[in-house]
Structure formats: structure tokens, C-alpha cells
């Protein structure tokens, strides 16, 4: 039997095809100059669940199912009376994905989740931060196959931030296009 370790599909594609395409397109002289994915951060704001801790727990459970690892609950830093918010209350959840889990999530996002979004026309190609990172938002988390539609109590939105080692937005956009991100502009 072969003792071959599992490697995510997109990681193999990056190693075998994308690196060469990026090197050719931008004329890098050193292999270490070629941009790569650094991490993907998933953030879910659950402000409506402040009063109900059960809703917060279901949101954390859903994010764990989507990401494949346990999320960190983000807490309020200070009290705001107008929002009935006290310091230390859970107001969101976040997960940072790296290495193989990052590539697996990206594969599910591009091939399964984005095509399932209602009225999806493509991603905004101008949502880069100037340092090679891309941020996008989803209005509902139901587009992921890990979520059972029948057992959902509430629909949550989420932010997805893709961090790369690219030095410019142009390099980062070229990298994400190679990963089949459906940019409109």
C-alpha cells in the first residue's frame, strides 16, 4: 500500500499550475516572490443573539460545521446601553483557517457555496484592501453544504477575508482568479 499523504485539490493545483502561471505573468525571479494564500478568516456577527445565549450557541455550532474547526466567541469590549449590551457579552464568532483546512474551505466556497447564492452575478473585484487581501460578505450561511436547511433556527450572515502574501491588489486579484474566483470587474 502506498503511504501517500492526503493533499487538498486546490493545494495541488496551486503547486502544479498556479505558481507557474503567476511566475510567467509577473516575471518573478525568485520562487519566494510568488504570492500564496496566507489564511482565511470567517467572521459571523450575532448581535441579535445577545439576549438569547441559545441562539449564540447555534451560531457557533453552525460556524464550526462550516469551517471544520472550533470558532472563538468574540465579546463586547465595552457596554452600550442603547443596544442593551454589557461588557463581555458574546456578539460574534470567528475562525482563522490555515494550511490544508484553508484550501478545503476555499474549494467548497468557490465550487459549491458561491453558485448556490441567490441572484449571484459574481464577486466585486474592487474589495481589496490595498495590501493584497480580499474581503467579501455572504447574506446567509445556508449556501454551505454542511448546514442542514431543515434544522436552521435563524439565518446568519458572515464575512470572509482571504489574506495573501501578495504585495499589491493586482497580484492578489490574479492569484484569486487562478483559484477560479468569479470576479465581475
Swiss-Prot record:
Disulfide bonds: none annotated. It comes from the Bacteria. Keywords: Ribonucleoprotein, Ribosomal protein, RNA-binding, rRNA-binding, tRNA-binding. The keyword Ribonucleoprotein applies. Pfam families: Ribosomal_L5, Ribosomal_L5_C. GO terms for biological process: translation. One of its GO terms (molecular function) is tRNA binding. GO terms for cellular component: ribonucleoprotein complex; ribosome. InterPro entries: Ribosomal_uL5, Ribosomal_uL5_bac-type, Ribosomal_uL5_C, Ribosomal_uL5_CS, Ribosomal_uL5_dom_sf, Ribosomal_uL5_N. This is one of the proteins that bind and probably mediate the attachment of the 5S RNA into the large ribosomal subunit, where it forms part of the central protuberance. In the 70S ribosome it contacts protein S13 of the 30S subunit (bridge B1b), connecting the 2 subunits; this bridge is implicated in subunit movement. Contacts the P site tRNA; the 5S rRNA and some of its associated proteins might help stabilize positioning of ribosome-bound tRNAs. Belongs to the universal ribosomal protein uL5 family. Part of the 50S ribosomal subunit; part of the 5S rRNA/L5/L18/L25 subcomplex. Contacts the 5S rRNA and the P site tRNA. Forms a bridge to the 30S subunit in the 70S ribosome. This is Large ribosomal subunit protein uL5. It comes from Caulobacter vibrioides (strain NA1000 / CB15N).
Amino acid at each position: 500500500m502506498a503511504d501517500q499523504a492526503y493533499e487538498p485539490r486546490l493545494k495541488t493545483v496551486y503547486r502544479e499550475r498556479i505558481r507557474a502561471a503567476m511566475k510567467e505573468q509577473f516575471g518573478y525571479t525568485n520562487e519566494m516572490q510568488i504570492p500564496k494564500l496566507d489564511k482565511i478568516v470567517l467572521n459571523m456577527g450575532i448581535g441579535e443573539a445577545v439576549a438569547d445565549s441559545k441562539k449564540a450557541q447555534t451560531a457557533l455550532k453552525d460556524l464550526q460545521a462550516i469551517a471544520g474547526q472550533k470558532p472563538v466567541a468574540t465579546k463586547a469590549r465595552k457596554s452600550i446601553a442603547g443596544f442593551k449590551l454589557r461588557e463581555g457579552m458574546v456578539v460574534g464568532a470567528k475562525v482563522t483557517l490555515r494550511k490544508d483546512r484553508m484550501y478545503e474551505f476555499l474549494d467548497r466556497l468557490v465550487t459549491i457555496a458561491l453558485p448556490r447564492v441567490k441572484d449571484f452575478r459574481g464577486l466585486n473585484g474592487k474589495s481589496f484592501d490595498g495590501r493584497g487581501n480580499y474581503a467579501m460578505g455572504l447574506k446567509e450561511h445556508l449556501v454551505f453544504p454542511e448546514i442542514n436547511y431543515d434544522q436552521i433556527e435563524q439565518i446568519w450572515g458572515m464575512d470572509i477575508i482571504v489574506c495573501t502574501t501578495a504585495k499589491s491588489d493586482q497580484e492578489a486579484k490574479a492569484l484569486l482568479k487562478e483559484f477560479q474566483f468569479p470576479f465581475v470587474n
